[in-house]
Amino acid sequence: MVDIVFDIGRVLVALQPERLLGLLRAHGGVARTLEDVTSRIDLTGHETGRVDGMQLLQQIAALAPEPISMTALQEAWVDMLRPEATMLQLADRLSRRHRIFLLTNVGDLHWAYLEQVVGLHHYAMDVLRSDVAGVMKP
């Protein structure tokens, strides 16, 4: 039996931040790319468990001069994760003959969303999340 390790972001899940960026712009923010946002918040702190989801959302909200509903912001933040159906099907097929493990740099909000929408733990024997481990994968 072979062990197979999948990264979650940009492998099993695509990143599509348009809704988040649009929400920020609608409230006076100037972010044009996801990198514009992540370079101005403590994403590493969030993805290593030192900054919880609500604190991260407050940091993102501060990027726009006009107030943003935390509910709308959270929905836009998690909505950027889009499951890649073909890759999830591949992981499912491989899991029938191999041991599958998942690695991810993720925070609590994204993980809760992925578990609800995709049920990623069903694809793997184990998952190593950066926010639980306290360190980021390379």
Regions found by a protein language model. Give the residues of each.
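Active-site neighborhood of HAD-like aspartate-dependent phosphohydrolases
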Residues: M1-S39, A62-L63
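A structural micro-motif
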Residues: V2, H98, H122-M125
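Generic structural signal for small/hydrophobic residues in well-ordered secondary structure
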Residues: D7-R10, G49, L94, L102, ...
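Hydrophobic alpha-helical core bundles mediating ligand binding, dimerization, or RNAP-core interactions
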Residues: L20-L21, L56-A61, L73-W77, H110-L114
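A metal-dependent, Asp-based hydrolase signature
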Residues: L43-Q74
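Short, acidic loop-to-helix structural element flanking the phosphoryl-transfer center
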Residues: T71-F101
